[in-house]
């Protein structure tokens, strides 16, 4: 099949993108719209699901128009999405009962702490591969069923939200499910997204009864779990809808798993790091679900139709690109492009370390009460030092993960494939290579998350025949090798660890 294209909807934390790819994996059209971030209280982060859906329709329509294509020119559509972000909606009206609770949202931290106090953390880890955290969908869904009650009272029916969910009147899903539902009318998720809910047993490959009971979440509201690339097809777009054609929707992957797939990390030991709002370092572990002893997550990487699940180890860093946004928020820079110029204007940070724990710390620390910290400042500190320290924090956090990854897997990564908006910054890429003392490879196509969704969708309909076809598409834009002496990198990293210690458990409750 060569006379068509594949489309990928990339629904991210800050906006929604639609990219059309050709058979070489090259971008034919790329359109994007931001959506509003809602912060109703400190530590709370919400998105409007209806705004996301409207933006999705807008970027898909604009992308096809920009490429001079009709919807019939698409062989398939794949979806990739911000993971863990949770929506509950009315099955009849299709309207959400509340804003989506975003993966960064920390409102359920105390609930997670109660799980720890009651000795349930290890059992959750055994079933899900996850560290119990407010990051995941389980406590978000529980909160919505408990606390969205006032929004429901305007409806004709006065029964509880849980009763309505048990009766099939309310549906829950991550953003992939929300988009699949609006595109096709089907209530579906894929294994990679299901594995991020803290409700899915990644060994038995099913929603877990014990977890559903713990969080009092009715099974009836959960989506059907399907392969990430599904020859059986999730559904088709409505020919009477906004596209005017019945396009098959055949794939879904959480954004980081999609990047793993787009970077063609198909074999055990292959690893990538994506630098976005947060950073996410994943290593393919094949058919083995490797348990972590060093604060990493065991997660599902992807599943192709008729094939076994492929697992991955993951290090989740909550704040990287968001730290650059913070520099803009406090007027230290005007735009992200300034960071390289400012950071390279000084040789060092002059002893300044920045720990961007604005929403707590993820792997390997898993401290929801850690907070952002700047240490080591003097009267001689200038904004260039702070900007450089912020970029260095991205590299140090990645080294945290790389060390844990090697300890858990027994595999030393020789070349780390990198992607995401921040890797356009050559200064950061070289710094990252120096700090982790590992070669970096940046691909020509930098939209690897969307590319992974497109690859998965295209495989399902025979647009590409095999994984080997995809491997042939992968091309290096630039490689980076360590230039820093290993002893210097170790010394800098040691001081980073001291700075992290000062950020931990800062946001204690009275």
Swiss-Prot record:
Which protein are we looking at? Answer: Glycerol kinase
| GO MF term list | ATP binding; glycerol kinase activity
Looking up PROSITE patterns in the UniProt record yields:
FGGY_KINASES_2
Biological role stated in the UniProt entry: Key enzyme in the regulation of glycerol uptake and metabolism. Catalyzes the phosphorylation of glycerol to yield sn-glycerol 3-phosphate.
Q: Which reaction does it catalyse?
A: glycerol + ATP = sn-glycerol 3-phosphate + ADP + H(+)
In its UniProt entry, the species of origin is given as Halobacterium salinarum (strain ATCC 700922 / JCM 11081 / NRC-1) (Halobacterium halobium)
What family does the database annotate?
A: Belongs to the FGGY kinase family.
Binding-site residues, ATP: 13-14, 277, 321, 421
HAMAP family attached to this UniProt entry = Glycerol_kin
Q: Which Pfam families does the entry link to? A: FGGY_C, FGGY_N
* Binding sites annotated in the UniProt record for sn-glycerol 3-phosphate: 13, 83-84, 135, 255
């Amino acid at each position: 099949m060569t006379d068509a294209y594949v489309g990928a909807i990339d629904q991210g934390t800050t906006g929604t993108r639609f990219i059309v790819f050709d058979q070489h994996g090259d971008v034919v059209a790329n359109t994007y719209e931001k959506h509003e971030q809602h912060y109703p209280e400190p530590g709370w982060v919400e998105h409007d699901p209806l705004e996301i859906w409207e933006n999705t329709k807008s970027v898909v329509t604009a992308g096809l128009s920009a490429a001079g294509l009709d919807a019939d020119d698409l062989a398939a559509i794949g979806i990739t999405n911000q993971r863990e972000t949770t929506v509950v909606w009315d099955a009849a009206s299709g309207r959400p009962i509340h804003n989506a609770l975003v993966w960064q949202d920390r409102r359920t931290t105390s609930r997670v702490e109660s799980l720890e106090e009651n000795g349930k953390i290890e059992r959750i880890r055994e079933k899900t591969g996850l560290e119990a955290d407010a990051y995941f969908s389980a406590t978000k869904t529980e909160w919505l069923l408990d606390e969205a009650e006032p929004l429901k009272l305007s409806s004709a029916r006065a029964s509880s939200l849980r009763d309505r969910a048990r009766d099939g009147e309310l549906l829950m899903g991550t953003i992939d499910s929300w988009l699949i539902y609006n595109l096709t009318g089907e209530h579906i998720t894929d294994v990679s997204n299901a594995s991020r809910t803290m409700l899915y047993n990644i060994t038995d490959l099913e929603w877990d009864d014990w977890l559903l009971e713990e969080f009092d979440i009715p099974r009836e509201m959960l989506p059907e779990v399907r392969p990430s690339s599904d020859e059986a097809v999730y559904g088709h777009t409505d020919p009477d809808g906004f596209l005017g054609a019945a396009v098959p929707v055949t794939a879904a992957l959480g954004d980081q798993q999609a990047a793993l797939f787009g970077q063609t990390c198909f074999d055990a030991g292959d690893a990538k790091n994506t630098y976005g709002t947060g950073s996410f370092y994943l290593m393919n572990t094949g058919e083995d679900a490797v348990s972590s002893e060093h604060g990493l997550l065991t997660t599902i990487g992807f599943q192709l139709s008729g094939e076994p699940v492929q697992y991955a180890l993951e290090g989740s860093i909550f704040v990287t690109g968001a730290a650059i946004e913070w520099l803009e928020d406090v007027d230290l820079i005007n735009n992200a492009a300034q960071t390289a110029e400012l950071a390279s204007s000084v040789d060092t940070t002059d002893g300044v370390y920045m720990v961007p724990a604005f929403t707590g710390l993820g792997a390997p620390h898993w401290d929801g009460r850690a907070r952002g910290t700047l240490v080591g400042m003097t009267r001689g500190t200038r904004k260039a030092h702070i900007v450089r320290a912020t970029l260095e924090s991205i590299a140090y956090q990645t080294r945290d993960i790389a060390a844990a990854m090697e300890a858990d897997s027994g595999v030393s990564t020789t070349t780390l494939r990198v992607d995401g908006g921040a890797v356009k910054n050559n200064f950061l890429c070289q710094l990252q290579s120096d700090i982790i003392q590992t070669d970096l490879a940046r691909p020509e196509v930098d939209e690897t998350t969307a590319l992974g969704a497109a690859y998965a969708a295209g495989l399902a309909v025979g647009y590409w025949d095999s994984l080997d076809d995809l491997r042939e598409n992968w091309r290096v834009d630039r490689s980076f090798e360590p230039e820093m002496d290993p002893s210097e990198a170790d010394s800098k990293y040691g001081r980073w660890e001291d700075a992290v210690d000062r950020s931990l458990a800062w946001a204690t409750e009275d």
